[in-house]
Amino acid sequence: MDTKRMLQNSVLALTDDTLISIGTVTNAAREVANDGVDQCDPQIITQASSLSKLPLEPSSVDIVIPIFRSIEFPGDLLVKEMFRVLKPGGTILIYSSQQSVIGETDKAISGLQRKLLLGGFLEAEALQPKPVGLSNVVCSFGVKAKKPSWNIGSSFALKKSIKSPVKVQNDDYSDLIDEDSLLTEEDLKKPQLPPVGDCEVGSTRKACKNCTCGRAEEEEKVKLGPTMDQLSNPQSACGSCGLGDAFRCGTCPYKGLPPFKLGEKVSLSENFLVADI
């Protein structure tokens, strides 16, 4: 809504006196804007100090202009009513039509500002004294304030600032290196298992009939028992082989043979080397 239309349709003037001129109201309204003041058709309520409730709908006017003589006007109840009828963002202009001593004026202005702030208004500020009305009545002081641009009970979401987590500088591991970088290509190659022999695998491994891995030759070398050369020319590294089994070690090739003299040929029966089974 523009200022001209606002001044024409939604101005309310209050006074504790029995009479007030329209010129007084229009001159006071010039504090808000000059455009459209001459076409202003305000609503005027006299002897407003006796009212406990204003006969207006809530949020129905844009400007409220109380002009008073008594230092006690407007009361707290009337301030509450003026706040109710003002639209969000509306303006209130309070004028005194009596001259006062400078010290009393400052005290009255401070009291009015405090009363308006407690009543819910914002930006309460003192106005410079100037003539008000057709009779050039001097306005000893005045106070201007605004109603908040939001309605009572309205709510809106607040944008919460997102705090990023604090980054901790940790240099304890700055000297460490990646272990994987120490590996070469040879280290990464999969090891090749040795080829499996053609002999059977089990808890008791032995050479097969057609052994080609050399196991048969190894088994022949470790077979216990005297060879033909040992029987023809018996020798002993320990010197006890010819004394009998009581003096022979566990791996003695002559174990099981009767006592003999070293260097003499040992005679065995024909079935000595034949297996019992």
From Swiss-Prot:
Family recorded in the similarity comment: Belongs to the anamorsin family.
Keyword entries, A-Z: 2Fe-2S, 4Fe-4S, Cytoplasm, Iron, Iron-sulfur, Metal-binding, Mitochondrion
Official protein name in the record: Anamorsin homolog
Pfam families associated with the record: Anamorsin_N, CIAPIN1
GO BP terms in the entry: iron-sulfur cluster assembly
One GO location term (cellular component): cytoplasm
Job of this protein: Component of the cytosolic iron-sulfur (Fe-S) protein assembly (CIA) machinery. Required for the maturation of extramitochondrial Fe-S proteins. Part of an electron transfer chain functioning in an early step of cytosolic Fe-S biogenesis, facilitating the de novo assembly of a [4Fe-4S] cluster on the cytosolic Fe-S scaffold complex. Electrons are transferred from NADPH via a FAD- and FMN-containing diflavin oxidoreductase.
SUBUNIT field: Monomer.
Cx2C motif 2 (motif): residue ranges: 249-252
Region (N-terminal SAM-like domain): 1-160
Motif range (Cx2C motif 1): 238-241
Top-rank lineage group of the source organism: Eukaryota
